[in-house]
Amino acid sequence: SDWSSDVCSSDLASHALIFNEDLRKRFRIYMDAGELDMGHVFAFLSVEAAYSHGTEWLDQCLAYIQGNIDFVDEFLKKHAPKIKAIRPEASYLVWLDCRELELSQKDLNEFFVDKAHLALNDGEMFGKEGIGFMRLNVASPRCIIEKAMKQLADAYQLYIK
């Protein structure tokens, strides 16, 4: 077989902190059964490098994401004032409070997908408290965020205002 079609990422690494002993045991059984805890040497090296030398990159990354959050917040205030950005406290996911649009969740989803041509997380998938909300991932290049906001503003001007 052609090696390029059999790509396997060798630098995947993750951590699971599970304080509940019963849940931790069940997790361990699952991981062992699937041989999912078999680390690769490059994964270990990349984790070590990230923890040892990643501070500058992380600081730059967080500043960039904060800039995207600021951009979305200011853009919506100016171009789609009935949609409010809720600034995240510890992530790159911005909740969009769309309740002032007074749309059903179905109509809200149709507005974002069919009119703005955006695929965001439907707030209702997180429970009834999420009704009237959409969730936007801003851990993207600024040009992608700008394009998404322009699409949203264009749809807002045509269908909401």
Sequence positions of predicted segments:
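Short, small-residue-biased leader/transition segments that mark boundaries at the very start
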Residues: 2-9
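Alpha-helical elements of Rossmann-like donor-binding domains used by nucleotide-donor carbohydrate transfer enzymes
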Residues: 13, 45-49, 64, 71, ...
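Short beta-strand-to-turn element immediately C-terminal to the catalytic PLP-Schiff-base lysine
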Residues: 14-21
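Glycine/threonine-rich helix-loop capping motifs at alpha-helix boundaries
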Residues: 25, 31-40, 84, 159
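Structural signature of PLP-dependent enzymes
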Residues: 25-33, 50-73, 105
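Conserved glycine-rich beta-strand-loop-beta hairpin in the small C-terminal domain of fold type I
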Residues: 41-44, 48, 64-73, 85-98, ...
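PLP-dependent enzyme catalytic core of the Aspartate aminotransferase-like
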Residues: 104, 111-120, 126-161
